[in-house]
Amino acid sequence: MKKTAIIHIYNFIRMSHTEPSRFLFDDFDTLRRILILVKQYGFPGTYALKYDALMEPRYQALLKEYLDENDELGAWWEITEPLCRRAGVAFHDTHMEEQYDDRVDSAYCLGYAPEDRKKIVDAYMADFYAVYGRYPASIGSWVMDSVTIAYAREAYGVGAACICRDQIATDGFTLWGGWPNGVYFPSRDNAFLPASDRETQLDIPVFRLLGPDPIYNFEANVRSGVMEGVFTMEPAWLPGRDPGFVGSYFDSMTREDALGIQYGQLGQENNFLWENIRPGLEAQLQQMERLVKEGKLRVETMAATAGWFRKQYRLTPPATFQVNSDWSGHGCSAQWYASVNYRLGLLGEEGKLRIRDLFVYPDGYRCRYLNDRIHTRQSLFDAPPVLWPQLWGGKEDRPFIRLVDEHGCEPTGEIVYDAIDEYTARARLLGHAEFVMDQGGFTVTGPYGLKFDRLPVLKEITGREFRLEYEGFAYGFTVARGVIDGLTIRPENGAIRLEFGADPGAVRREETVPVPGLRRSAGRPVPPVPPVATPGDAVLPWGEECYVTLRSRDAGIIRYTLDGTEPTDGSEVYEGPIRLTDDAVLTAVLITPQGAESEVASFCYRFARKDLKLTSPTELDHREVFHGNGLAADLLRTDRGTTDFLDGRWRGSLQDIDVTAEFEPGVIESVRMGFLSHHRSGVVFPKTVELYTGADRDHLVLKEVITMPDGPGDREIERRDAVFGVNGQIGAFRIVARRHKLMPQWCIYRGTPTVFTMTDCLIVRPGEEKA
């Protein structure tokens, strides 16, 4: 089927992630670099401002300088003490100087009475208008209530809203059972769920954030051995920069025979910092650029899509969210179907097709925080469950709804997901059974029954009605076709039919609404993309030569130097691979035919002995990204770690880093070991680094102790080598990096014992042999 595939580049902008807020240059510079990168690819962006960033003049000036009429400014709905004071509302925080995500009862609108929520909206909107001369086009937060969303829409014309993906107990938020991905019209009583009719519907589309993986995002807490990580398109995390996952996600949007609007959100909070955001975001933009040129993808602002959606649909249209193959190689597949009445999650694994998730969307299921504020530090948004494996089981006893024959055995075969028409989708277990999902329910054809492993919400079965109750709320579903046998439903005349609500019929308006388009802009010119070197920062074998190539995304000439100075008009022009035989710092700049210059790119190359035998008792973190092949194998690798702690080149431990090297005796000029500090991620430089040297490992004596920096640096993320002058003949050495026992007081996690020490390499530079 022809499909609509839409991406939003939506970035969450905070001046600070703690209360009270303070200006942090790294966070500010991260936004500047994101703005430039998105503009370099020519895409529109949506930038949602927390109140502290809204009121900071430096952020105001930056956004006014870079944004144009194709971009959108929105509100990021995290509550601060100054915003409450401006609104005349008491700030409820009792956990000052903690991260916002841990304080749902004060830093989010749920922590305030409904009338106070409106006062907070009024205060924010007044200040936003004073700064930008208009109201924000969208409003977003990890969690929001329908009171806030409705008031922002009705009082200030805000056109779109967004909330977090489904997740379990992450950062104080549990959201599970809602629209699995994409966009819907919310209910007035519960913004987490789609409205079933126009009377109960808010006239503002809600988007789900972060681009969840249709397979593994929904396997949280129920799959043994599942890969660790955050399974979203967030570029600061491993899946979001994994080419396999990113490619699979875009394929699910553009190549799958899926139903309805295929949607993804890219972007990240600026407090994750540029060094960790850039590797993933740039790779995602590169793939997007190709898909846009092929006409397969629309890149829009959130409010632009919302305006189109509101004109095109009278009710939320059904949608599927699916992948027929597994990017991770584990052999799974998944399909989600959602309508105004229910959502159904199907999982394919080892040839078995199972229902893994089923929630219903009945009228009357109100949000817990509709009429009262939250009084705990953990929030919960959900829907009435028919199958909630995370709540009713776990990794060892996970429940499904299974296809079974008369002996209780599950069939196996090839699994295929597709769409039949704009309202109906299908999942086939070829040669055995077929699920057909429509807006009112689903039908299973074939000789197999449906067996519920567990249904703790069951109150009674009356005729064809399963009557259920969850937290005092009564609901249920109808077996319109099938023979009920306890918790198994057998086929009736070759089929089973479950219904969850009335089919609303056609939800698309008859007229076709034109899609939003980009406008010509006289916005600020952005610099071209800097040159890239291959290899990047590297440690090369002593006595050999290396050739470095430079390439650029944009047309122009590249000028470079090899002594670390910035290139000038008189510097060498790059014409081919650069030959290196000794240490060098390569700096390069791209100059376009129009005379625009990129930022200067810098790359460091060192030559060192590689014939070392390394041993280490240090236990590394078990995660592959921090463990690799171990210290002994990886400290002599060629490529150096970057300022991105997830680049796979840093070896991390909660122990002291302790490494002994043995080699053919010779004169050694220096020994250096590389370290990383990124305290927001729990990584700091070691307290001290000790070097022991000797003729062999049995005769080592203390040579020197280096005290590493212990305090905020010029940049939040820093690399630094501990460099020891040896200048003598040795055959062995030992380096011990002593970690802090507790995180230092200047760190965000001050006083906690989980102090990571990270190292990337050992560099042993030979000296000159005396005659």
Describe the function of each predicted region.
Residues R520-G630, D634, D639:
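Low-complexity, disordered linker/stalk regions enriched in Pro/Thr/Ser/Gly
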Residues G523-V529, T534, A601-P665, L676-F685, ...:
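Disordered, acidic Ser/Thr/Pro-rich linker "stalks" and the adjacent N-terminal cap
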Residues F12-R22, D29-Y41, A126-Y135, A191-T305:
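Catalytic grooves of carbohydrate-active enzymes
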Residues M1-E69, Q262-Q265, A334-V340, G345:
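Active-site beta->alpha N-cap acidic-glycine motif
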Residues L346-T424, L430-G431:
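Acidic-aromatic substrate-binding/catalytic surfaces of carbohydrate-active enzymes
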Residues D52-V143, E199-F231, L259-F272:
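Metal-dependent polysaccharide deacetylase catalytic core of the NodB/CE4 family, i.e.
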Residues A113-R188:
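Catalytic domains of cell-wall/extracellular-matrix polysaccharide-remodeling enzymes
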Residues Q655, H679-A771:
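Trp- and acidic/polar-enriched beta-sheet ligand-binding modules for extracellular glycan
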